[in-house]
Amino acid sequence: MGLPWYRVHTVVLNDPGRLLSVHIMHTALVAGWAGSMALYELAVFDPSDPVLDPMWRQGMFVIPFMTRLGITNSWGGWNITGGTITNPGLWSYEGVAGAHIVFSGLCFLAAIWHWVYWDLEIFCDERTGKPSLDLPKIFGIHLFLSGVACFGFGAFHVTGLYGPGIWVSDPYGLTGKVQPVNPAWGVEGFDPFVPGGIASHHIAAGTLGILAGLFHLSVRPPQRLYKGLRMGNIETVLSSSIAAVFFAAFVVAGTMWYGSATTPIELFGPTRYQWDQGYFQQEIYRRVSAGLAENQSVSEAWSKIPEKLAFYDYIGNNPAKGGLFRAGSMDNGDGIAVGWLGHPVFRNKEGRELFVRRMPTFFETFPVVLVDGDGIVRADVPFRRAESKYSVEQVGVTVEFYGGELNGVSYSDPATVKKYARRAQLGEIFELDRATLKSDGVFRSSPRGWFTFGHASFALLFFFGHIWHGARTLFRDVFAGIDPDLDAQVEFGAFQKLGDPTTKRQAV
């Protein structure tokens, strides 16, 4: 046939049987990848420390998606929250992976069957005997079925009526677990961080889809609309389908990057905005202040801060710190977190408490500056010693740790104080194991960053695909040079533009 690579899909343009076949094969490839990727991740995943080495630090991509839908147990005898289990049941991580692979195999066989048996009666128009698809009717069927699936997910799976529920956590990602969710029918259901909105929106959208599907099954489109939107052309279907996909990709890129109830930080890691706004730092200080108000000592108040909360307040977990083209998990970057060293409190020789100014997201290096409670600079690590006025040595800065492994330990040696001041720029201080994975010390992004980048990139690509195929289907007659209303019998090749006698070719 000699088709160029970018036109090979035209072979299924007027062949409904094989058009169906290639779509089934595509589904087989997607399901097969999902199942295989899940098995690979399970083979390399270490579930032993869900606090300091969670799935998102290890670069897991499909495990978080299974977990948010209610899968928490493994046939390996472990639970995602760190416990051990004896009866994981069929729908474990491995069970879901296996189901995808079996489904992929069945789709593969179905695709081959439909490729071989492409000339089925169901695809024939009984009036003409030629292959033909009733596209508005097919649209109605698909809309109805997707509406049923959408409604069923919201009404049964999410609510726990028939299913496990979904992953729900507190605003600081500390108490997450799978639980049933009641639909939120009030205005709170529009808050992207309210899990109840997931149930209510699926129920509402599913109901709308069912009704719209029934409408399109029972009502034929007007002839002018049918012709105007080229509803008989399969490329119209391609164009509008691409539009639906790129729109969805843009939406999920946003919900992933900015955060929502559908992308819990326990499964995908924190967002960059939580670092930018000092979200976890404020909560830590609030808890410490509450502890001090209850007459706890400073050491006791800091010791009650959950290690999980402290770990979120560390710049190495910020998805915007990893370069887009740095391959590997966060653990391959700064290392595997082993333990919290505690919160460093710096003081000058007058006893005034000093705070290290934190590194903004998009800086690789940042000057070490210590300010007091009023934001006035009191100490720093100078670039040029000859002009320094606030150096750690001159100001006499000391550091004392509260909570964590160094609780109660203090240092006055300037070199040690400067070391911890530099590390305090990056948030709470953790001991990191860089030997096990030969980590290079360069920050990596989390699956939150990869997902966003991938979906935003493909959404942009698919947006152009929608414009391209939409233009092709709407202006097909212009591009082909054939007037769709042309009734006269014309000879191909006689004119430069088909049927236009003013463009008669010159005899050679």
Swiss-Prot record:
Q: Which GO terms describe its cellular component?
A: chloroplast thylakoid membrane; photosystem II
Annotated transmembrane regions = 21-36, 101-115, 140-156, 203-218, 237-252, 457-472
Q: Which GO terms describe its biological process?
A: photosynthetic electron transport in photosystem II
Its keywords, alphabetically, are:
Chlorophyll, Chloroplast, Chromophore, Membrane, Photosynthesis, Photosystem II, Plastid, Thylakoid, Transmembrane, Transmembrane helix
| Record text on cofactor binding | Binds multiple chlorophylls. PSII binds additional chlorophylls, carotenoids and specific lipids.
GO MF annotations for this entry? chlorophyll binding; electron transporter, transferring electrons within the cyclic electron transport pathway of photosynthesis activity
- Does Plastid appear among the keywords? yes
What Pfam families does the database record attribute to this sequence? PSII (PF00421)
Q: Name the InterPro entries on file.
A: PS_antenna-like (IPR000932), PS_II_antenna-like_sf (IPR036001), PSII_PsbB (IPR017486)
Q: Which family does it belong to?
A: Belongs to the PsbB/PsbC family. PsbB subfamily.
Entry's NCBIfam families? PS_II_CP47
The entry's function note states: One of the components of the core complex of photosystem II (PSII). It binds chlorophyll and helps catalyze the primary light-induced photochemical processes of PSII. PSII is a light-driven water:plastoquinone oxidoreductase, using light energy to abstract electrons from H(2)O, generating O(2) and a proton gradient subsequently used for ATP formation.
Give the HAMAP family listed for this entry: PSII_PsbB_CP47
Q: Which protein, by its recorded name, is this? A: Photosystem II CP47 reaction center protein
The organism is Arabis hirsuta
